[in-house]
């Protein structure tokens, strides 16, 4: 009951512009994860980057269950199973980047598409966290039941062999 589990893995590509560049990123993300891609939109206008509000500028995929486990194993292998302690937040979640999509098995470089990087975010939880999200009789999670940084590091080390610097 106390061991953390992987709730979800979010894979995000921030392209910074709409058009063919974003479509290429969506195709790459769809091929890597095998799941449908969702577009991300700009929250505000940034004239310095010529980005308008509500313009599509990125894409993401949320993986859960067995797909999340398999993708996480592959992604951690790409970063050589080493993470930095600063990549963990206070809730035990971890985020890391992958510089090139060509590092994934089965992906090759295409000069027409280019090279894309991506961010991977792993959300950890303990069984029983639903009590704070349910509509009826919602309760706060006690501090002892929350996932801490040390719990997350121990879980990733034990389950995936990750070394934290």
From Swiss-Prot:
The keyword Transmembrane does not apply. GO terms for biological process: translation. It comes from the Archaea. Keywords: Ribonucleoprotein, Ribosomal protein, RNA-binding, rRNA-binding, tRNA-binding. Coiled coil: none annotated. PROSITE patterns: RIBOSOMAL_L5 (PS00358). One of its GO terms (cellular component) is cytosolic large ribosomal subunit. One of its GO terms (molecular function) is tRNA binding. This is one of the proteins that bind and probably mediate the attachment of the 5S RNA into the large ribosomal subunit, where it forms part of the central protuberance. In the 70S ribosome it contacts protein S13 of the 30S subunit (bridge B1b), connecting the 2 subunits; this bridge is implicated in subunit movement. May contact the P site tRNA; the 5S rRNA and some of its associated proteins might help stabilize positioning of ribosome-bound tRNAs. NCBIfam families: PRK04219.1. Belongs to the universal ribosomal protein uL5 family. Part of the 50S ribosomal subunit; contacts the 5S rRNA and probably tRNA. Forms a bridge to the 30S subunit in the 70S ribosome. This is Large ribosomal subunit protein uL5. It comes from Methanosarcina acetivorans (strain ATCC 35395 / DSM 2834 / JCM 12185 / C2A).
């Amino acid at each position: 009951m106390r061991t953390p589990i992987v709730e979800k893995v979010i894979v995000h590509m921030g392209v910074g512009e709409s058009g063919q560049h974003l479509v290429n990123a969506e195709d790459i993300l769809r091929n890597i994860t095998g799941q449908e891609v969702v577009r991300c939109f700009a929250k505000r206008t940034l004239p310095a980057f010529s980005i308008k509000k509500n313009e599509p500028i990125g894409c993401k995929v949320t993986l859960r269950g067995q797909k999340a486990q398999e993708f996480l194993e592959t992604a951690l292998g790409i970063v050589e199973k080493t993470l930095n302690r600063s990549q963990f937040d206070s809730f035990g979640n971890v985020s890391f980047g992958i510089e090139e999509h060509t590092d994934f098995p089965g992906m090759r470089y295409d000069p027409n598409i280019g090279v894309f990087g991506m961010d991977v975010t792993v959300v950890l939880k303990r069984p029983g966290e639903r009590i704070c999200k349910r509509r009826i009789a919602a309760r706060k999670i006690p501090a002892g039941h929350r996932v801490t940084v040390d719990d997350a590091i121990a879980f990733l080390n034990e389950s995936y062999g990750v070394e934290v610097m």
